[in-house]
Amino acid sequence: MPSNQNRDNFIDKAFTVIAESIVKIMPIAEKEKKAYIYYRDGLAAQNNGDYSEALEYYKESLLLEENKIDRGETLKNMAIIYMSNGEEDLSIETYEKALEENPKQPSCLKNIGLIYEKRGRYAEQNGDLDQRDIWFDKAAEVWSKAVRLYPGGYLDIENWLKNSGRSSIDIYL
């Protein structure tokens, strides 16, 4: 019986071959095809843990991509890498750019909130309760937006908002 890794590699390769075939026959401009190929290569590098290579591919994709939804997705993936690398400020900045391109990405808001909440916990551990409240309030603000965009999708966040007293009555409006 093949290992899960072998099966996953086979699926990845099969998907790549199918995607390449579709891209070749699609009636889209060459520029858009190249943007997609850079994006796809960036995603593959990111999945393999080669973050610097992934960022390079994503940057190339952004130079060519004109579709706002696709640009937002690319920027979101870049922000995830920055977040993984501990570059929180750059991650927040990139998530915000992703939201400018496509405001309907609740995961961007969720992840910004995670950074704010982490900073709040850090302030709390250091005894700075005023700073804690500032960061927790910022987390609540972006998390409330995420929950409005994706009701029921972030139950842990909804519980945090409720338990921390930062939930508003209109959260689902």
From Swiss-Prot:
Subcellular location: Cellular thylakoid membrane
Repeat keyword on record: yes
InterPro entries the UniProt entry points to: PSI_Ycf3_assembly, TPR-like_helical_dom_sf, TPR_rpt, Ycf3/AcsC/BcsC/TPR_MFPF
Keywords: Membrane, Photosynthesis, Repeat, Thylakoid, TPR repeat
Membrane topology: Peripheral membrane protein
GO process annotations (BP): photosynthesis
TPR repeat boundaries on the chain: 35-68, 72-105, 120-153
Pfam families xref list: TPR_17, TPR_8
Chief place of localization: membrane
One of the record's GO cellular component terms: plasma membrane-derived thylakoid membrane
Top-rank lineage group of the source organism: Bacteria
SUPFAM superfamilies xrefs: TPR-like
Family affiliation: Belongs to the Ycf3 family.
Family matches, as HAMAP family: Ycf3
Function: Essential for the assembly of the photosystem I (PSI) complex. May act as a chaperone-like factor to guide the assembly of the PSI subunits.
Stated name of the protein: Photosystem I assembly protein Ycf3
